Amino acid sequence: MTYGATVAEILALANNGARLMPLAGGVCYSEEARRRIGDSKLEDVFASARAPQGALTGQYLYFSCRDEAHEVAQSDGSAEGSYWHAIVHRQEPDPGNSSYWFRRVGKHAIFPALLEGARAVEAASPSAKLDLSGVWDPFAFIEVCERARRQPGSEMEAAAMEVQRIEWQLLFDYCARRSRD
């Protein structure tokens, strides 16, 4: 999916949307990305996006610029804003606060595709113990991330990071895609 030249240039600073983000902690991955995202005008970059603020939050979060991501998500009352807000707190890590925001999300349109992607990751890494059920459960994934971050370098951490990348890609695409698509 293409989101325009500005977004492509920014995402190109870190693996074109395929970066594995840390499950917790860390600092902003790219000061240049932070600057370029901050300098771009939301109405220009995501003019016809389904959820422009959500797309902006997703860009900041992709580069682990959590303060900026949190600020934008906090001002976005949509389900997508709550979803990004939940991810910010999951990565903080603050599982209770993340759960609060996921309760505000409810059932999101990306959940079926996210479950499918997570199942593929689980099939490739069965010892990772992702504990998937018949529907995507963001609360269970918070627990997976909590366990995984306490096992640095483990198969579980790698699998959780891969699922988190899939989640980011799906949610960013959902937000940044043109509203009429």
Question: Which residue stretches match the model-derived regions?
Answer:
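N-terminal alpha-helical interaction modules that lie
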Residues: 1-75, 104, 108-181
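TPR repeat positional signature
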Residues: 53, 82-85
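Conserved small-residue packing positions in alpha-helical repeats and bundles
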Residues: 57-58, 86-89
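Short coil/turn linking the two alpha-helices of tandem helical-hairpin repeats
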Residues: 91-93
